[in-house]
Each structure stands twice: as C-alpha cells, then as structure tokens.
C-alpha cells in the first residue's frame, strides 16, 4: 500500500505551489516551533555525563580538587574559558588545566553552576564566590552575589560592603552601600567599621551633602570618636576633619558648652578658627548670614528615607506583647514580630539600626531585662540586663550611649541613671538626678539629656521641675520649670525644641502642651491636643510631632494625632492602631530596604 502523499506547501490562498517558487518562501508562513525544555534537558544530560566522567575532555584543577568537564560547555558559558580554549594558549590543548586564583570548593560550585544554573549564595561564601565569578566572567553569578550583599546592608557592615564592592568593581553595589551609609550615618558611626576607616574615607563620608542626620552634632561627635580611637596617630588630622564639619549649623549653646570645651579642638589653632567662624555666623543678623557663604554654612540635603513608627507593647488593659508599625508613606498599620514577653511602661529608643525595649512591667514584676529588635530580620533578641529594675522610666540616646533614667522599682521612685554601651554589651551607673522621678519623660537637645516632670513618690505630688544631664561633667542641673505639673507626659524633640505633651496632675488628665527653648531657658504654651492624654508615646518625623495612644483617664486610646509647629495645629491621623494602648514604647525607624 502506498504512503499518503505529503501535504502541499502552504500558500496564502491554500493552493499548491512548487517549493522552489521564486515569489513565495514557505518559512515565512509556517509556524516556528520552539521547545523551551530542549536546552534544559541537554544540559541535564551533559551534567550526568560529567558526573560519570563520560566524554569529558579536560580536567580543571584547583588546590587538591580535580573537576572533569567538557571544554565546549565551559567555553559556551564562560568568556574566560572561551578565550582559554579557543586561543593559542597551551591550555587550549592541555588535558589538565590548573586555576590558581580560586580555591577548589568555590571552583566546583561555579562549574556546577555552568551545568545546572543553580547556586546558593550565603554569608559564608559570598566573599570568595563574587571575585571568583568575576574571574570566570560569570556575570549572572556576580550579580546574584551583589544582590545578596545589598540585602544584607546594615549599619554595622555597610562600610565593609562598600569597600568590598569598590575592590571588585561592583559599581551598583558600591553606590547603594554608599547611599545606605549616608542615610544611616548616625548608626554607622557607632560601628567598628567606621572607627577603623582611613582618613580619606572618613573625609569622603562626612563631607557628603547627602548625610541623613538630625543635627550636625552627629558629625562632630563622629569625628571626635574616630580621632580618640587612635588618638596619638589621628589627632594630627583634626583640622582636616573639622574642615568638613558644618559648625555654623550647630546651636550656639552646643558650640560653647561642647565644641569649645573639647580638648582636641583646644589643641588646634585651625580648629579654633573654624569655631570662631561659627560664632561669627551666629552673631550676624539673618540677612547678613547669606553673605557668609562657605561649604560649612551650606545645609545638607539628604534623600528622604522612608520612615516607620514602631509601637511596642503597652497596657491594653494588661501588659501585651503586640508590636505595630505605621508606614507614613502608605498611611497604614501592620503587625511585626511580637515581643519575647509581655512588656509595658518600658523605655524605647532606636540606636545602631535596632529598637531597644528597656525595662518596664510584665504584668506582675518590674523588670531589668532589655530586648532589641532588628527591623531587617523582623526578630527580637535579648541583650544585657540593666543593673536596676525600672518601669515608667525614660530612655534616650546621647553620644552613642543608651540612657535609662529614673523610673519605679516596685517600691520606690528612682533618681538613679544608668547607661548602656552597645559595643561592650554592658550597663554602668552615672550621676543620679537631683530628684526621684517615675513616669518621667526624657529628650536630648544640644548634647544635653533632659528629664521632664514625673512623680517623686516622696511628696506624693506630680512634678513641674526639669533637670538636664551634662555627660562631660557627669552632673545634673535644674533648669526652668514647666508652667504646670506633669506626670506621664509625652516628651519629644522637634527643631531643637523640647515638647512636653499632656500627662496628668493627680486625677486631672491634660491635653495642654508646652515647649522649652534651651536658648532662652523658658517654656511657652502651644496649641492643645484634640483630646486629653497621659502615658502616651511621642516621636518626631518629617517636621511633625506625633502623639500615640495613651489613656484619657477612663480608657486606653488607639488614636494618633500630630502637631505642625508652622500652623500651631493638631490633626488626628485617620488610621488608628488595632488596639487602644497606654504605656507603649514608641520610636521612629528607617524603613527596611
């Protein structure tokens, strides 16, 4: 029986035409079939052949590792091997090729990748994998390594990643690590990596217009810390470093009380000249300051890093573990990892890229435990305990140390103060306050730590007194009193001014707000909040002062409102927390990338 005839060649009209027709090309009109699995299957078979040492025509050697392979596969996937095997080098004919620049295990991983397109990048192997991928010109692997390192950026390692990226010509990673260091400057300068930088690298960093800092104090203190880390060698660089510190942008009080008293400044005539320049700037009328143009009078213009407000624990109505974050850009709340244990009435700070929950009350006991939260890992970790049990304490960061101020230990109000060194993971006592203060609010302005109001437990009265701590002198000094007694007031700092928000005097819960100006040592009233609040959290972000939760004397509040100093007006945020809570810890953090 004859086979059926082949179908005719395709034509537009469906008629038969000879295949050699000059006016029609059948390839134009017949569909092209592409099998996406063909290459994958082919490489799978080639890898199986390699594993059985079949048809292999070269052995790649590194250290004591011997890896059989196929020249054509290596040449097809790696420009390095392509040049080696198709050129006139002796390796093009050799049965064994030794690679001296790469260790055996790393080379095996990369040749495995050539055959399988699979590779696992980890913290342990990325520093050897990336340069090896660069040598073999496996750009996809190098890119994967860079993306992994970018995901690991943190204040404690970004400078090291920046140097690594520079060494291996990873331009995109270099730029991202540099931007990260600028955006997290206040935390980066607390790291060992910063203290171990060379002078050129420090100057490059502190001269950037893009530094994200709350005040130029951060730059000055970073310079002093870097020099003191190896004082005998580095003090000769003081003048060169101070050229990049914008002293005219610092408050006059800070210049007099901190900069002028710094021994490293006193011992340098050039540094004194920069200080004189700054003092002259402050003495000039505003309109004349515009004429005094220099790099040190120019405002830094950082990129706006997205922020999150973190609300930790609190009473609702008992101590809770819940942690909520508010995204200012998206205007919504979301839950993150819970506290390891119930905690309310704790101190709260953001330091070195971590949130610290300090002391507090767990529902039955006042505690001295401290937990830290890593926003990148969404994970809580315990650190060293305080020396004393404290609840309703104040917590703040001054000169790279975390201070726990006053509070209540379960039997009496406390005047004691202790500080935490994150590098040594140790707490130590400093000078006590002049007054016992529980339910105290604290804030840092101009290099001084302020303790505002509270309850002394002895007179059984709420306090209107305020005192400030000078870390250099290790002493507390009374300053001007508030206009009214406030215990459980929220305290925040905005534009170098100290705000005392709400609080109570006995059963009277307040919605009034007053603000302290260190330059005049005086308090003044500003607009009242929309509702009475005590034991609320306070934080400043984007030029606004936020007040979170608290209670009004009868119930816990889930609402949030913010104060705009330009309009002297309070506005209630449309989105509330998932639950009303008072005595919660509140702070603002950089949104994880």
UniProtKB/Swiss-Prot annotation:
Among the GO molecular function terms of this UniProt record, one is: actin binding
Show the ranges annotated as biased composition (Basic and acidic residues): 17-29
- Entry annotated with the keyword Repeat: yes
Gene Ontology cellular component annotations, sorted alphabetically: actin cytoskeleton; Cul3-RING ubiquitin ligase complex; cytoplasm; cytosol; lamellipodium; ruffle
Q: Which PROSITE patterns match?
A: BTB (PS50097)
InterPro entries noted in UniProt: BACK, BTB-kelch_protein, BTB/POZ_dom, Kelch-typ_b-propeller, Kelch_1, KLHL2_BTB/POZ, SKP1/BTB/POZ_sf
- The record's principal subcellular location, in a coarse class, is cytoplasm
**Region entry Disordered: which residue ranges?**
1-29
Q: Which GO terms describe its biological process?
A: proteasome-mediated ubiquitin-dependent protein catabolic process; protein ubiquitination
Localization: Cytoplasm, Cytoskeleton; Cell projection, Ruffle; Cell projection; Cell projection, Lamellipodium
Q: In which pathway does it act?
A: Protein modification; protein ubiquitination
SUPFAM superfamilies noted in UniProt: Kelch motif (SSF117281), POZ domain (SSF54695)
Q: Which SMART domains match?
A: BACK, BTB, Kelch
Which residues are in the BTB domain? Answer: 56-123
Keywords carried by this UniProt record: Actin-binding, Cell projection, Cytoplasm, Cytoskeleton, Kelch repeat, Repeat, Ubl conjugation pathway
Oligomeric form and interacting partners:
Component of the BCR(KLHL2) E3 ubiquitin ligase complex, at least composed of CUL3 and KLHL2 and RBX1. Binds actin. Interacts with KLHL12. Interacts (via N-terminus) with FYN (via SH3 domain).
Read off the PANTHER family from this record.
KELCH PROTEIN, KELCH-LIKE PROTEIN 2
Main function: Substrate-specific adapter of a BCR (BTB-CUL3-RBX1) E3 ubiquitin ligase complex that mediates the ubiquitination of target proteins, such as NPTXR, WNK1, WNK3 and WNK4, leading most often to their proteasomal degradation. The BCR(KLHL2) complex catalyzes ubiquitination and degradation of NPTXR. Responsible for degradative ubiquitination of the WNK kinases WNK1, WNK3 and WNK4. Plays a role in the reorganization of the actin cytoskeleton. Promotes growth of cell projections in oligodendrocyte precursors.
The name of this protein is Kelch-like protein 2
